[in-house]
Amino acid sequence: MNASTKLLAPLVAALALAACNAGGSSIVPSAPAQSASLRLHAAAPRWMAQGLAKPACPMVTGVPTCLALIESRGGISPDVAGWAPIDFQTRYNLPSSTNGAGQIVAIVDAYDNPNVTDDLSTYRTQFGLGTANFTKYNQDGKTSNYPRGSTSWGVEIDLDVQMVSAACPLCTIYLVEANSSNNPDLEAAELTAVKLGAHIVSNSWICYSSNSCVKKADFQKPGVVYTAGSGDMGYNFNGNPESLDSVVSVGGTELRKSGSTYSESVWNGAGGGCSNNGSGAGVPKPSWQKDPDCAYRTDADIAAVADGVAEYDSYGGGGWFTVGGTSVATPLIAAVFALAGNASSQDAGKRFWSLKGRKRNHDLHYISSGNDGSCGGSYLCQAGTKQFHTYSGPGGWGTPNGIKAF
């Protein structure tokens, strides 16, 4: 961690106490600098304020950290607790049993989870997904000499490979483990993922409050779709790599089921909003974004479930437990790109911003309720405003309804 790195400062002592009582980090965010036109939120996201989860990795700004949130620990059955592959496949109308063979999805994470292969096998056996086509690499592209282990990043690693499996069981999955969570190592792993042949690279990590943490050149290779989580700290707590206009920024939703009917609302922790997140100048606005309330790159682009998902982790997680965060949604969206099979012809989030109304309304689920903070009623934090078509910052243009939007 470099000298400029700082822990997220406390909002109020009560929120810090709530996080501690939940077994989570006592580090909670301070509000970003006041916007000239919109009032930013001054509260921690609900998962933190109410002690509903704790971060798997330390919550810091300026350097990469993983986005997995631990919601429950061990001793539960995935049959009764946690969303499972059938829920994702049904809600998102995915052709998971027929599509995806030959498609390579790479996961880039830091450090090693030595149990990831066995954990993935347990997950896939539990849910009838068959044998995985899975390979683990180090950041140099070798299948040996892995980095040292980390139980924190181990939670993220298991989550990522299991979510790709959940949506695309026939996909080939490459896990590329960076030597550390330092920027140069993760960037090296990104390059290795592409050299290995992946056309889809999933990143469930973020540099909060930084638009210069990683080099855009490492996330802008022709014919490659990069997905990255928009963050778990709510409105305007975004950062690299998801705020790059060459990356698909993935927000989050809460999934509900009544009988056989699913519905979604914005997950309150989802990052999103305007990329001038209180740390200085934002990412320049790409020409394909025309929304009115942000003069910089607006995120997220798309979303998926980010709460209450079943995971199996024998390395540091004690078996089955439930997890959340945009680290759930990010590999799910990567897998949907693989199911569609068009990754090599995509242009990051531009695809979703360019959809016409009828196609958008048919091929994506409109997220019409929920927020990730307070922003004066703007679509940047509030779903369902229709101020800019069906878009909202935390929910993007919606969640998948089949693969035609991808």
Describe the residue ranges of each PLM region.
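Bacterial N-terminal signal peptides that target proteins for export
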Residues: 1-9
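Processing junctions and N-termini across compartments
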Residues: 14, 51, 59-60, 369, ...
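C-terminal motif of bacterial Sec signal peptides marking the signal peptidase cleavage site
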Residues: 16-19
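Bacterial signal peptide processing site
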Residues: 21-24
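Substrate-binding/charge-relay-adjacent region of secreted/lumenal peptidase catalytic domains
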Residues: 28-252, 276-324, 330, 341-350, ...
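Polar, glycine-rich mid-to-C-terminal structural blocks
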Residues: 249-280
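Walker A/P-loop NTP-binding active-site region of P-loop NTPases
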Residues: 336
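An often Trp-containing, charged/polar helix-loop segment at the C-terminal end
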Residues: 341-393, 401
